[in-house]
């Protein structure tokens, strides 16, 4: 009797033979209401107008999301000048300077605004402070699209960017007519609180929002990461490297005393990272779909017997409506 053919790949070990791994899922994690709305705007524009629909900048900072929309017919560009005349264009969730829709109007291009309503709220705050004659200190990261968009709501010189606590200690704005501060929505809650405290100490009459402009989703996800970090040997944050809120989650875990890494996808996981890890925390940035978390768990199950539980610090029920042209 002929020998049986050798299998193409090793037979997976039975589950009982796999080493145990406890997984703590941070909750909430993943998509926020602003990201969900932005994606729905692009999808609805494609449904109504057909492909292609142009999108200025990545609609949200996640390549998985961008590539999925590209397969549906979205075309991503960096400037309105790249959009053919007559084609619709969507502005990303991060917001844009006022010069961008003005350029679209000048070229006769129809546009849809997918700016997160919480970012738009910051824009309106800036306009109110400027109308009252106040110079504005914007707490945020230089070069981030949200900061560029927010500072672009007013004339050059109307705002001064403050990125760190050290800059807050040394900034010398013209405060003859009063000062105000606003913040990027995706910052570290703790870092921003420190910067605001310094500014209030130096400028007691500075005006600001009743609470910092950091959005509910950013705040909730950072609190959830803090909750799992203390119980984890390693925290994996699913998110893109250019995602501010995802990077902040990694930093929050590290400041809690836990090793942390940022992964764009499950495929990017290097098994050496898990050497000596028996308790693994997992979260995902506000622009990362839950599908990526599911794929990471599937990959982990190939090597470990998982015990998965969730640490949910708050329930979220925020939903943002589509803009009027698509409602």
Cite the ranges covered by each PLM segment.
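The feature marks the mature, well-folded catalytic cores of soluble enzymes
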Residues: 2-3, 7-286, 290-327
């Amino acid at each position: 009797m002929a020998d049986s053919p050798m299998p193409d790949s090793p037979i997976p070990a039975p589950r009982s033979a796999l080493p145990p791994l406890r997984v703590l899922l941070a909750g909430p994690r993943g998509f926020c209401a602003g990201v969900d709305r932005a994606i729905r705007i692009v999808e609805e524009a494609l449904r109504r107008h057909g492909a292609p629909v142009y999108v200025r900048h990545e609609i949200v900072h996640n390549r998985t999301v961008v590539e999925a929309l590209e397969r549906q017919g979205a075309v991503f560009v960096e400037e309105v000048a790249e959009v053919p005349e007559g084609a619709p264009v969507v502005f990303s969730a991060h917001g844009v300077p006022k010069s961008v829709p003005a350029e679209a109007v000048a070229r006769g291009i129809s546009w849809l605004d997918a700016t997160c309503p919480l970012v738009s709220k910051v824009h309106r705050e800036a306009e109110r402070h400027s109308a009252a004659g106040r110079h504005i200190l914007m707490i945020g990261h230089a070069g981030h699209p949200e900061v560029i968009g927010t500072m672009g709501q007013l004339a050059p010189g109307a705002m001064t960017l403050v990125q760190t606590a050290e800059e807050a200690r040394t900034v010398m704005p013209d405060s003859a007519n009063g000062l105000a501060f606003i913040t990027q929505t995706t910052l570290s809650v703790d870092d921003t609180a420190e910067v605001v405290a310094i500014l209030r100490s130096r400028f007691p009459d500075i005006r600001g929002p009743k609470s910092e402009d950091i959005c509910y989703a950013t705040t909730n996800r950072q609190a959830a990461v803090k909750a799992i970090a203390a119980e984890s040997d390693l925290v994996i944050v699913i998110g893109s490297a250019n995602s501010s809120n995802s990077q902040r989650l990694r930093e929050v875990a590290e400041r809690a005393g836990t090793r942390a890494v940022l992964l764009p996808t499950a495929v990017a996981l290097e098994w050496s990272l898990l050497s000596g890890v028996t308790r693994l925390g997992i979260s995902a940035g506000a622009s990362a779909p839950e599908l990526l978390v599911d794929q990471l768990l599937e990959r982990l199950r190939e090597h470990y017997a998982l015990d998965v539980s969730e640490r949910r610090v708050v329930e979220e029920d925020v939903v943002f409506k589509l803009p009027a042209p698509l409602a």
